[in-house]
Amino acid sequence: MMNRRQLLGASAAGAALVSSTAWSKTTNMGLPDAALMESLLTQAPLMPSTGPDYNPVVTLNGWTLPFRMNNGVKEFHLVAEPVERELADGMTAYLWGYNGQSTGPTIEAVEGDRVRIYVTNKLPEHTTVHWHGLILPSGMDGVAGLSHPAIPSGKTYIYEFDLVKSGTFMYHPHGDEMVQMAMGMMGFFIVHPKDPAFMPVD
């Protein structure tokens, strides 16, 4: 027979187990699949399947990150992680990147789109993602300790903002950025003009 103290301890442990299980399920519910690219070859660009038409970019030695539509929002999933690349026979580089590549995949969207970007951190240290050159709310700017806390290892952070200006931008970390960028953590962020006639592009 359990005494009162043992009963309370068992109840607390059970509640903690249930709440942690529920929390882990809810944190991953609805998370878009994280595409992974292991090939070093230039991949064919993704043609737009919804929304305004545009001429997608070809990323040399890279690829375009796929997205899914969720109630009118384009959802992407970036995974910050260690990456191994054989640069030449017997010469392996140990890099950091996104979704199996260093540098990371190109993100493409259209001016006026609302994007939601899930960033999962599989690095051995904290990170963030700064959307370089984009006009967005301060809380989405990705500067660790200033606009929001750094993303701890093993956690996912959600960035969400409207793309108000077209252009060629980039993304990179702003949490230990000197090390992380030197290790290869960066990628293109292309925002196509809503009106293709506004500024002709190749």
Which residue ranges define each predicted feature?
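C-terminal segment of N-terminal export signals and the immediately downstream linker at the start
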Residues: 1, 21-70
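N-terminal secretory signal peptides and thylakoid transit peptides that target proteins
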Residues: 1-15
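N-terminal processing/targeting junctions
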Residues: 14, 24, 60, 102-106
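Non-catalytic, glycine-rich low-complexity segments
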Residues: 65-68, 79, 193
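A short, structural micro-pattern
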Residues: 72, 183, 200-202
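Histidine- and aromatic-enriched segments that form or immediately flank copper-ligand environments
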Residues: 75-191
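Low-complexity, Pro/Ser/Thr- and charge-rich linker/hinge segments at domain boundaries
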Residues: 192-202
